[in-house]
Amino acid sequence: MRNRVGGSRRQAWSLAVAFVVFTGALTGTAQATPVGPVDLGTLPGDDNSTVLAVNEAGVMVGLSMSGPNPQRKRPVRWDASGQIMALPTPGGTEGQVRDINTHGVSVGYVLTATDAVPTRWDAAGLATTLQVPPGYHNATASAISDTGVAIGNWLTPDNQFHGFRWDPDGQATDLGVLPGETWSMAEGISGDGQIIAGSAMRAGANHAVRWVNGGPITELAPQSWSSGAGRINKAGVTAGSMVETRSGPPIPATWDRDGTIHRLDWPSPHSVWLYHIGSTGYVVGTGYLNAPRRNAVLWDPDGRLTVLADDNLGAEVEAVDAYGTAAGSFQRQATVWYRDGQRTQLGQLPGGSRGQAYRITDSGRVVGTADTSTGKTHAVFWTLR
């Protein structure tokens, strides 16, 4: 799940805007008690595991790991009940799986003795090596659409870093760079595979770009001094930020499917980072509203800002669902923040002391990690509804 579409959006934005602070008090209908965590375990002989992606059916992909130095990472898949399966690594013994689509098809890469090789695994876990043009190398696939279009990044024959895409039939396309430049990165893709979000260099600064229907690279904020917008939901709405002048304040924003920009409330001259955009347009991130303290924050589909309750102790937010439920951590415990103002810390594994939530689905599954009684870190999931 890397996952909007909102109704009306405000056309004007002001640094003087008011924002809401969640106190953690229950202000609406009580939420169901979360169930879990369910320990997803590791492959035999491994120590730790983590979930990197989950689809709406609850199928999860991630890593099973062993050894501190060097650490061996193996791609794995868990079915919705939590049964683990090793994904094959043709030509190597290690690799990573980075994303999974609605149909259970996942992508990542396998590490061979000399190279990173992009790989796709079908819903049954069978591996296919994705072809790379002659001279291109160290290619890693990082996201896949529901239509089977995969994206990632590779090194060109002259060792330049470029974004690329693979069509469902395996045809590879270099996505190119901005005129006169040498670097680009593909970071996310819409559910229909038509819009790819990423970054590229121009005049020594990073710039948010996108590719539509495999077309040429275009800038999302061409008048800005710098920008970045690598978060995209299934509807093709992109989230990121920009700086209009070298010394100007950061401006968080979303871009509609047609490229129309909407500035999000941010009454601060200090840094802000956007981490995830949900399927209906909620956005989460962190930033310094009142430096030096950093806040976990949420924007609704109209761009209104909410500071997530942290009792002035700090919190991290990673993801948000269609209903505005945010997932992350507070006081080293996996935590969700509901739109009615309730903050709920999720359960721990027996004997464990900490946890972290990384993703949340619209169907109510939260995935993350939690410590075991022996100090290992295991992939886990909780159920909200």
Residue ranges and their predicted role:
Residues R2-A32:
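Secretory targeting and sorting signals
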Residues Q31-R385:
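Residue-level hotspots at or immediately adjacent to binding/recognition sites across diverse folds
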